[in-house]
Amino acid sequence: MEKKKMGLLVMAYGTPYKEEDIERYYTHIRRGRKPEPEMLQDLKDRYKAIGGISPLSKITEQQAHGLCEHLNDIQDDIEFHVYIGLKHIEPFIEDAVADMHKDGITEAVSIVLAPHFSTFSVKSYNKRAQDEADKLGNLQITSVESWYDEPKFVDYWVKQVKDTYASMSQEERDSAVLIVSAHSLPEKIIAAGDPYPDQLAQSAKMIAEGAGIEHYEIGWQSEGNTPDPWLGPDVQDLTRDLFEQKGYQTFVYVPVGFVADHLEVLYDNDYECKVVTDEIGAAYYRPEMPNAKPAFIDALATVVLKKLDESK
């Protein structure tokens, strides 16, 4: 029996490929407004601090291709063909959809490399893909909206947290708190009924319960540079407050809203949060990110197949 041919659209935020890309990338994030020279320099300095341009583009490719290969290995009905679509740099989401159309793909499934749904992120990615497909015609896209509660994904983090706690001394474990975080978004999303904060709270609860961790807190990180208020508390402020008010001496950070080693994790956690823990004399731990680890790729494949099953 001939396999059905299907597009696999993997969408992500995107990252500069080289230093010369930083300005146009940042300009795209700012909706066409060029950043002030000091803002641009600040971003360049952050990339320098993590050892140069973020590894995110390579990791995204490994995740997307790994997912496609794994999907083709674990079932025999569909032959998946992968396309990467990025939000803020080429190949843009629209480019990926146009390529699928050009290759004669009439059916596709899409997934965003962000576990929680929000109108700001996942909804906008899916809309861009859908709008382009509608414009081109004869291409139907089934979109995954969120996958934070996929048991295999939760298990990935449970295992990482357990391993991290097992690596600590008894003294560190006794004074430890788990901080589960995601990318902050403008507070106005709450008034609009966005499920994003609730989904993060559910993630934190599932991971903490699964790993048998009693003391855990929810934080937000990497907020944008705009006058609007953003969701808080910020992870750095939260770290200080927890130290001062509850006396924790060991901080374990799980940035569950992200899936790879990139600027928000390597700088905002490993540098900025560590500055705080060093300042207060506390221990800093951050379990490994999923990147393209087989357990994570398998979790994503399960999500995709479940979605296709649901939409039959």
Curated annotation (Swiss-Prot):
One Pfam family linked to the record: Ferrochelatase
Entry similarity comment: Belongs to the ferrochelatase family.
Function: Involved in coproporphyrin-dependent heme b biosynthesis. Catalyzes the insertion of ferrous iron into coproporphyrin III to form Fe-coproporphyrin III.
UniProt entry keywords in alphabetical sequence: Cytoplasm, Heme biosynthesis, Iron, Lyase, Metal-binding, Porphyrin biosynthesis
EC number per UniProt: 4.99.1.9
Name of encoding gene: cpfC
Predominant localisation class: cytoplasm
Organism expressing this protein natively: Bacillus pumilus (strain SAFR-032)
InterPro entries with a match to the protein in the record: Ferrochelatase, Ferrochelatase_AS, Ferrochelatase_C, Ferrochelatase_N
GO terms for MF: ferrochelatase activity; metal ion binding
One record GO biological process: heme biosynthetic process
GO cellular component terms listed in the entry, alphabetical order: cytoplasm
Pathway linked to the protein: Porphyrin-containing compound metabolism; protoheme biosynthesis
Enzyme class of the recorded protein, top EC level: lyase
SUPFAM superfamilies (UniProt xref): Chelatase
Name of the protein: Coproporphyrin III ferrochelatase
Record: residues binding Fe(2+): 183, 264
NCBIfam families: hemH, PRK12435.1
